């Protein structure tokens, strides 16, 4: 298993507690199932559609429900846990069969942003069912609990937007967690070599998929303001392109400022390389619509200089100017970066304070996903779960 910790770490913690897990793996695309140290072939049940294209995508949830029903009839299971809204049919099947079950919800931010622009009533409900079918259904169906990440997902606001009664299940809205080095990674400011392997003071990074909510175009504008002031920085946009509109906005901003040759789109990179891009830049930029996301936790934990826009999404963690840089306009952001470039000792202090903040305030992977694993186990065994916080 690979990907974000939220997708695999709960399984890791459950296995460490002695649980046995079978995985129902489903995709409308051709995939190969590979064994791992923890999951043998008999633990991996692959579900494929019978048809290709749109028809295969439509029939896949029905196959998932059928496979879930077959598994639950064939042997005893204590719990069914659906990862992402695509698992709705499996969780729904378990609920109908009286098996304790829950859903880990993802992908709600865009849905909330889109639906709140539509007048409440049947038009909003119809759009939700049409464009966000399984998120909408999963929010209305019975289960023991639903868990969403309190990182700008807006899953809490979505209930009010849709007018959904939460009483059909417990709703948990918890912060995410990342792997934070116990010791601050050392950056050699005098090392010789090429970025991102070594520090380059005239490099900036923006880590994350190119998407509307990430606002890479704002980073390009900051770069443009630096060039207008005579500082030839380079900007590295590290992440896959998931929005053609944002990709075009970046190109347009680069053309407007005449900095196209200084904007580098690297595509998707391994996590270790992403950390290099962040750590070995003068600063890593977070100018998104909402910045309390995994990458914020990760780059702070790496002891990076983070430059974020003043949208208050990370206010609870930052001491402005001491562990993070905050700006209101792109011109102000450029001025702050120039000042930082000319004060290496201050940059080192900000890096040290960022890492200290991460150690003292962020949830570790073990604590956060240990809580999730224990919640699953307590729910499966019928124990009282009233002591689990609804919001972290």
Task: Locate predicted features.
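N-terminal subdomain of nucleotide-sugar transferases
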Residues: 1-32, 363, 392
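Active-site proximal beta-strand in glycosyltransferases
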Residues: 81, 94-118, 125-127, 147, ...
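A short, active-site helix/loop in glycosyltransferases that binds the activated sugar's phosphate group
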Residues: 128-170, 176-180
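Conserved donor-binding/catalytic core segment of Leloir-type glycosyltransferases
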Residues: 148, 192-214, 220-223, 236
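Glycosyltransferase donor-sugar binding loop
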Residues: 207, 234-249, 267
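Nucleotide-activated donor-binding/catalytic signature segment of Leloir-type glycosyltransferases, i.e.
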Residues: 248-268
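Acidic donor-binding loop of glycosyltransferase active sites
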Residues: 276-291, 304
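A charged, aromatic-enriched C-terminal amphipathic alpha-helix characteristic of glycosyltransferases
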Residues: 344-381
């Amino acid at each position: 298993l690979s990907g974000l910790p939220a997708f695999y770490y709960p399984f890791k913690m459950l296995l460490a507690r002695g649980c046995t897990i079978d995985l129902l793996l489903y995709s409308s695309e051709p995939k190969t199932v590979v064994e791992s140290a923890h999951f043998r072939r008999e633990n991996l049940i692959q579900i494929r559609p019978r048809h290709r294209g749109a028809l295969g995508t439509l029939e896949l949830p029905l196959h998932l429900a059928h496979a879930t029903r077959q598994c639950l009839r064939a042997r005893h299971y204590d719990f069914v846990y659906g990862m992402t809204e695509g698992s709705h049919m499996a969780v729904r099947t378990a609920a109908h069969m009286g098996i304790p079950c829950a859903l880990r919800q993802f992908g709600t931010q865009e849905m909330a942003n889109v639906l709140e622009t539509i007048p409440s009533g049947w038009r909003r409900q119809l759009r939700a069912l049409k464009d966000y079918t399984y998120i909408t259904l999963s929010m209305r169906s019975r289960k023991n609990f639903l868990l969403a990440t309190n990182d700008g997902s807006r899953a809490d606001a979505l209930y009010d937007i849709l007018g959904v009664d939460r009483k059909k299940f417990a709703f948990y809205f918890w912060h995410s967690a990342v792997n934070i080095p116990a010791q601050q990674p050392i950056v050699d400011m005098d090392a010789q070599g090429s970025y991102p392997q070594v520090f380059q003071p005239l490099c900036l990074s923006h880590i994350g998929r190119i998407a509307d909510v990430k606002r890479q175009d704002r980073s390009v504008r900051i770069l443009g303001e630096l060039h207008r002031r005579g500082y030839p920085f380079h900007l590295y946009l590290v992440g896959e392109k998931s929005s053609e509109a944002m990709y075009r906005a970046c190109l347009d901003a680069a053309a407007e400022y005449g900095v196209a040759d200084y904007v580098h789109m690297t595509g998707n990179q391994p996590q270790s390389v992403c950390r290099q891009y962040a750590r070995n830049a003068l600063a890593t930029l977070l100018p998104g619509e909402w910045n309390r996301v995994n990458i914020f936790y990760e780059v702070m934990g790496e002891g990076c200089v983070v430059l974020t826009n003043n949208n208050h999404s990370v206010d609870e963690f930052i001491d402005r100017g001491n562990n993070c840089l905050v700006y209101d306009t792109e011109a102000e952001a450029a001025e702050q970066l120039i000042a930082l470039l000319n004060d290496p000792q201050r940059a080192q202090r900000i890096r040290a304070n960022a890492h200290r903040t991460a150690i003292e305030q962020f949830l570790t992977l073990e604590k956060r996903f240990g809580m999730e694993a224990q919640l699953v186990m307590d729910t499966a065994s019928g124990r009282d779960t009233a002591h689990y916080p609804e919001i972290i």
